[in-house]
């Protein structure tokens, strides 16, 4: 393709200098390469750090990257416009006659151009849209472009600079996609994943139909980044300062488990006490990383409930996961059971019913979110000895928000999974239901009921449960071990029903919170409490009426008692007056008033 050069007359600012003809040559792009001809290295632009440009700069006596004026004014790619020769020769650069032969000419080493080169700045999308390097299409160029797109190799126009930019790593601030975790326990996670699949399908169709269209390489990259699914952020070392040391003051270590250790800390800002769980070993890339993230996901979805340990925040430091939770001043149920076993003092039946009812309410809330805990046991039940206000959280009609002295809360949500798409991580085998061991995940909520029954039975004084063996199988067959206290038969029957070998026969968490055994003695339903309250209010209203009547009668009696004394006092005063001080010559008026 032949392009006729066009002469451009430039009038210099110095009137003593003769005008010069500045020739512009256009080189072929890589789209019109002939077999055995140029490979596109002689394009309009060249990388400043390439060996060819460095050699040319040394021969011409230029500093790397262009003239000294260009280096002073350079602020980004395309920020310095193409200057006329007169603009170059008005500065402190060499004279016009010395640099006149250096105007752009066709040389074996490639063309030179006064356009400043800036290797550190990536080509901008808006700069490409100017199409400064496009040439009229020929049938051969269109066919070659169609073949390039069909082979999924989108080629850049513009020569070496853009091909090198394609190979170079893309800056994070240009096409970076926000990396966020997708919470698997939220309903939106399914919509996000499905929408990502639809976007990928649309992109494939777009690439197949784009052979005859003029597509920009940068646009394709940007679209690919937009529809790419979000990547999971691993637990890696943070660049920030230690948040644990900056925001919290550690008081003591209050527990240790398989995951890590729990510390009692005071937040420096608000002065409140929190429980911060820190993993024992780095979790990045380990098996426990998924469990740690699952616990954070579950806490974030569940929010606040009086019978679930409250979650505040979580972060990673030095590849360790830290979770800030509510501090329960009563410790765990496992600690209380161990102390009771040592002192031979066990939970009474009313206390066992209270424990069962409160934990069942927590499970009801978790199950209502289509989640299951899968690791209910005494060490994951925490005790708070503070009284909850009656306006804390709205419960069901038959549930009481809590006015007792002890509040039981469910914690350690590392094994929580979704009912619809379970990813079961087996918990403690001592409290594990048999169907879960057999990988039957159709009744996962009933597995939590099974574990709750054994937890309550352990608080009643039962021996530590086995991890396997004949006794383990006997319990899965519905046989409870003996306890060192006498319990009512109806309560024992409820516990046996909760560990039934058939998961369908076990009561649900909703049925447990309404069970008559749990609401008979120590607990009353909200409806019963309302009836009793209305009766007391009616009695109180009657008593107030009687009190008002008594007060009125007493006031009337006192008034009648003082009435004769006032009459006698007035008559005596009138008799003692024989003369009048004023109006002696006037007749006294007669009044019929008693006073």
Swiss-Prot record:
Subcellular location(s) per record: Nucleus
Residues with PTM Phosphothreonine: 186
The keyword Cytoplasm is annotated on this UniProt entry: no
Chain positions recorded as ATP binding sites: 254-262, 277
Impact reported for residue 186 to A: Abolishes kinase activity inhibition during M-phase. Does not affect ability to phosphorylate cdk1
Coiled-coil ranges from the UniProt annotation: 526-563
Biased composition (Polar residues): 1-17
Catalytic function, reaction form: L-tyrosyl-[protein] + ATP = O-phospho-L-tyrosyl-[protein] + ADP + H(+)
Disulfide bonds: none
GO function term, MF aspect, one: identical protein binding
Residue ranges occupied by any Protein kinase domain in the UniProt entry: 248-518
Major location (coarse): nucleus
Catalytic residues identified in the record: 375 (proton acceptor)
The keyword rRNA processing is assigned to this record: no
Entry protein name: Wee1-like protein kinase 1-B
EC class (word): transferase
Residues where Mg(2+) binds: 380, 412
Pfam families, A to Z: Pkinase
Residues covered by region (Disordered): 1-127
């Amino acid at each position: 393709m032949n392009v006729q050069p066009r002469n451009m007359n430039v009038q210099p600012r110095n009137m003593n200098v003769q005008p010069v003809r500045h020739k512009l040559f256009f080189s072929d792009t890589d789209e019109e390469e002939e077999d055995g001809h140029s490979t596109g290295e002689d394009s309009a632009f060249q990388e400043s750090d390439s060996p060819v440009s460095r050699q040319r700069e040394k021969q011409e006596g230029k500093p790397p990257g262009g003239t000294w004026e260009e280096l002073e004014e350079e602020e980004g790619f395309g920020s310095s416009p193409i200057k006329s020769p007169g603009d170059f020769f008005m500065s402190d650069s060499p004279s016009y006659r010395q640099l006149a032969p250096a105007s752009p000419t066709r040389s074996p080493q490639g063309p030179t151009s006064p356009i400043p080169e800036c290797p550190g700045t990536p080509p901008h999308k808006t700069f490409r849209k100017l199409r400064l390097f496009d040439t009229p299409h020929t049938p051969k160029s269109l066919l070659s472009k169609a073949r390039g797109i069909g082979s999924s190799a989108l080629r850049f126009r513009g020569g070496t600079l853009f091909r090198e930019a394609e190979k170079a790593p893309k800056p994070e601030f240009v096409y970076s996609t926000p990396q966020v975790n997708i919470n698997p326990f939220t309903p939106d996670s399914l919509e996000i994943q499905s929408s990502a699949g639809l976007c990928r399908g649309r992109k494939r169709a777009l690439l197949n139909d784009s052979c005859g269209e003029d597509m920009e390489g940068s646009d394709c990259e940007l679209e690919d980044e937009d529809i790419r699914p979000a990547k999971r952020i691993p637990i890696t070392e943070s660049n920030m300062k230690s948040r644990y040391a900056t925001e919290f003051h550690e008081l003591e270590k209050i527990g240790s488990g398989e995951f890590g250790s729990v510390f009692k800390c005071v937040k420096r800002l608000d002065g409140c006490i929190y429980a911060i769980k820190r993993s024992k070993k780095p979790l990045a890339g380990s098996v426990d990383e998924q469990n740690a993230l699952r616990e954070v996901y579950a806490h974030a979805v569940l929010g606040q409930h009086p019978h679930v340990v409250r979650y505040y925040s979580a972060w990673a430091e030095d590849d360790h996961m830290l979770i800030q939770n509510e501090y329960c001043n009563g410790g765990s149920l496992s600690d209380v059971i161990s102390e009771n076993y040592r002192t031979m003092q066990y939970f009474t039946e009313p206390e066992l019913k209270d424990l069962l009812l409160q934990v069942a309410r927590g499970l009801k809330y978790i199950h209502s979110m289509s989640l299951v805990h899968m690791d209910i046991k005494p060490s994951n039940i925490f005790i708070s000895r503070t009284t909850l206000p009656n306006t804390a959280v709205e419960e069901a009609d038959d549930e009481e928000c809590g006015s007792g002295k002890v509040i039981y809360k469910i914690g350690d949500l590392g094994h929580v999974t979704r009912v619809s798409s379970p990813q079961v991580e087996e918990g403690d085998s001592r409290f594990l239901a048999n169907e879960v061991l057999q990988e039957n995940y159709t009744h996962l909520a009933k597995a939590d009921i099974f574990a709750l029954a054994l937890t309550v039975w352990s608080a009643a004084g039962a021996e530590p449960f086995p991890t396997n063996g004949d006794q383990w199988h006997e319990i899965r067959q519905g046989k409870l071990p003996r306890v060192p206290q006498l319990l009512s038969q109806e309560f024992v029957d409820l516990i046996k029903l909760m560990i039934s070998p058939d998961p369908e026969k076990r009561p649900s968490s909703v049925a447990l919170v309404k069970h008559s055994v749990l609401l008979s003695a120590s607990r009353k339903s909200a409806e019963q409490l309302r009836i009793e309250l209305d009766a007391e209010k009616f009695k109180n209203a009657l008593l107030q009426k009687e009190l008002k009547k008594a007060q009125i009668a007493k006031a009337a009696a006192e008034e009648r008692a003082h009435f004769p004394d006032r009459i006698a006092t007035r008559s005596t005063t009138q008799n003692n007056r024989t003369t009048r001080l004023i109006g002696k010559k006037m007749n006294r008026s007669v009044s019929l008033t008693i006073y």
